[in-house]
Amino acid sequence: MRLSLFGAIVILALATGLETRAAQGELLSKRYDFKDSVVLEVSESEPGGLRLDTVQFQLPARTGDRLTRVGGLLIARVAVSNTGNEARKVGLAIALFDDEGRLLAVASGGNKLTAIKPERQKTFSLVFDGVNAEAHKATAFQISLEPKP
């Protein structure tokens, strides 16, 4: 049986796509109890060698029932280690929820240019902008770590 040039290109493209997805690793997504101004030890790994080490939230001061916008940002500092033997990029997303399950604030980030080298750790600062006025009511957070090619 003769394989056409088009067929060979399609097979090569599919094989490359599957290989890339396998090399990327799997999405790691878990929910935890929220605590402000405390370094939370997470220590969860995805199969590709990226480990979510710690999360620390920094909330600005409150005035009454709202966050004070002057002089402060709502930030999550997320430490990620690369325990593998190849440089890796990562995408991060984090969401805050109250005890009723309402979504209070979201932030995302990750590598823009340089990957995390093997056996190294990088700390990402994720800023919660837009909807975040009731973030101080958070009782839980969900964080997702997605390996990138």
Range-by-range predicted roles:
Residues L74-A76, V90, K122:
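Hydrophobic core residues within well-ordered beta-strands of beta-rich domains
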Residues A79, E86-A87, A105:
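Intrinsically disordered, glycine/charged-rich N-terminal periplasmic/extracytoplasmic linker segments
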Residues R2-G7, G17-I75, T83, D99, ...:
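Membrane engagement elements in two modes
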Residues E86-E100:
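Short acidic, flexible loop segments centered on an aromatic residue
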Residues R102-K137:
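Short, solvent-exposed, Trp/other aromatic-anchored flexible loops in extracytoplasmic proteins
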Residues I11-L14:
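Classic N-terminal secretory signal peptides
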Residues R69, N85, K117-E119:
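Surface-exposed coil/turn segments at beta-strand junctions on protein surfaces, enriched
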